[in-house]
């Protein structure tokens, strides 16, 4: 039997999941996306060449791997085919390697218009959404008025359903947000044209994954645990469940089939958009982390906020997702610092707590409690052998393991796939 491994971002997203999934996929037969949409931005660097994927699983770069988009993903067909076109131009036979669940909810241009109109209307209270229609699409899915990929199998019915849904969207856009309506007829024709190309890619992902019982399968999470709609810093969250449990319901694979849950976390913390961030450094340290770590969002181009590693937030993610091990990324970004801090607890209303509280208001009231470490002041960039790490860097990693109570099994020391220390083989 193959191993079924779930890869979850343990912070506020942007932890480096794409590189790690790409690396692990060398020993896998399939990779599955199970939540989110094209608001994800997974950056891969292979042999010095950079590829950014937003919707298609990171396993698409491997010729021996099937890539699946599960039912928990919300699908923008325009974004999908832009990505397919770009990858095909690079010589990657995407249509041979990719299959998509018919149960995926469809993102329409009117979802995107609503998303952007709502964010504009919020003004200074904006959430920080990517403006790509993710939230409004999930909203329609839950309200059972949304369209699914399988609806394209019946063009006449699809036309009627889309007409009704977009009429509702346009009413909101014009009468509540005072924005321009989206052209319904043009959108219907565009989406029906996409339908002809997407039909061959449709497959029941639940059944398809049963064919991979003897192979390793990677379940690729998007965003991060602290952006979970239920367990994250609500309302400054994404619109899907990002914890490990969503790998099951978002792909149709039973939870007993999942063997190992890997947390991805940077050696420090970043966040894009609005919301509380107790260990944020709005100073020279934050500037240094942003510059050296090249902290710019792959999906939006927005600069990320930066701060020290936040263990109470990681503990919240650990409780939600039952991580078996940790992959620590961007260790090399800390190389030049004289001292390095870890937020080990919060002070909340004069009480010391070691797990991040639920919701944004309580988290905003927390003050970080730090433990300070002497920096190693030696380059770790590109190191592949743990023995070559400076002792102070190893002490830093050991302290993270001690606080979390689980092992750091992978250490990333650079963007390239080869810049990795594998302390434990996760896939045989």
Swiss-Prot record:
Q: Which UniProt keywords apply?
A: Cytoplasm, GTP-binding, Ligase, Magnesium, Metal-binding, Nucleotide-binding, Purine biosynthesis
What's the short name of a Pfam family annotated to this entry? Adenylsucc_synt
Q: Which residues form the active site?
A: 14, 42
Which positions are annotated as binding substrate? 298-304
Major subcellular location class? cytoplasm
- Give the subcellular location: Cytoplasm
Q: Which domain of life is it from?
A: Bacteria
Q: Which GO terms describe its biological process?
A: 'de novo' AMP biosynthetic process; IMP metabolic process
The UniProt record lists the keyword Magnesium: yes
Q: Per its UniProt record, what CDD domains does this chain match?
A: AdSS
- CC cofactor: Mg(2+)
Record note on cofactor: Binds 1 Mg(2+) ion per subunit.
Q: Where does this protein hold GTP?
A: 13-19, 41-43, 304, 330-332, 412-414
**Can you name a GO cellular component term?**
cytoplasm
Recorded GO MF terms: adenylosuccinate synthase activity; GTP binding; magnesium ion binding
Q: Which SUPFAM superfamilies match?
A: P-loop containing nucleoside triphosphate hydrolases
Spell out the subunit comment.
Answer: Homodimer.
Q: Which family does it belong to?
A: Belongs to the adenylosuccinate synthetase family.
Q: What does it do? A: Plays an important role in the de novo pathway of purine nucleotide biosynthesis. Catalyzes the first committed step in the biosynthesis of AMP from IMP.
The name under which this protein is listed is Adenylosuccinate synthetase
Q: Which organism is it from?
A: Dichelobacter nodosus (strain VCS1703A)
| Gene (UniProt) | purA
